[in-house]
């Protein structure tokens, strides 16, 4: 698998882990709160663990000075997911910041 694909998947898994943590904080049915929290935190750990393993393979191939800023994709994924899944409001300035992050990632990615 391409190192760049691994990097994107590592970022997506990290984002998924964050989203599972958010879901663990959401209300659940009475009497099922503990199961709800354990399920979502377990999923978070699974996603974050798999993301870390992919991240280690990325670091074997790409200098950390290039790879680490690419994790800024997490801000993009989390913003899109919060907006799309939980209908969280996103201000114009926030969207502008997301756009600038994407531009920065493209600039870094094409400099390798």
Curated annotation (Swiss-Prot):
Keywords: Cell inner membrane, Cell membrane, Lipid A biosynthesis, Lipid biosynthesis, Lipid metabolism, Lipopolysaccharide biosynthesis, Membrane, Transmembrane, Transmembrane helix, Transport. Heterodimer of ArnE and ArnF. Residues 35-110 form the EamA domain. InterPro entries: EamA_dom, Flippase_ArnE, Small_drug/metabolite_transptr. Belongs to the ArnE family. The keyword Plastid does not apply. The lineage of its organism: Bacteria, Pseudomonadati, Pseudomonadota, Gammaproteobacteria, Enterobacterales. Pathway: Bacterial outer membrane biogenesis; lipopolysaccharide biosynthesis. HAMAP family: Flippase_ArnE. One of its GO terms (molecular function) is carbohydrate derivative transmembrane transporter activity. Its main location: membrane. GO terms for cellular component: plasma membrane. GO terms for biological process: lipid A biosynthetic process; lipopolysaccharide biosynthetic process. Translocates 4-amino-4-deoxy-L-arabinose-phosphoundecaprenol (alpha-L-Ara4N-phosphoundecaprenol) from the cytoplasmic to the periplasmic side of the inner membrane. It is found in: Cell inner membrane. It is a multi-pass membrane protein. This is Probable 4-amino-4-deoxy-L-arabinose-phosphoundecaprenol flippase subunit ArnE. The chain crosses the membrane at residues 37-57, 66-86, 89-109.
């Amino acid at each position: 698998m391409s190192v760049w694909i691994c990097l994107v998947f590592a970022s997506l898994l990290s984002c998924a882990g964050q989203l599972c943590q958010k879901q663990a904080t959401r209300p659940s049915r009475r009497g099922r709160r503990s199961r709800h929290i354990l399920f979502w935190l377990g999923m978070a750990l699974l996603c974050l663990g798999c993301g870390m393993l992919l991240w280690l393979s990325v670091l074997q191939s790409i200098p950390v000075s290039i790879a680490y800023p690419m994790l800024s994709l997490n801000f993009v994924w989390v913003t899109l997911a919060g907006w799309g899944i939980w209908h969280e409001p996103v201000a114009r300035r926030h969207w502008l910041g997301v756009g600038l992050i994407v531009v920065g990632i493209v600039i870094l990615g094409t400099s390798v």
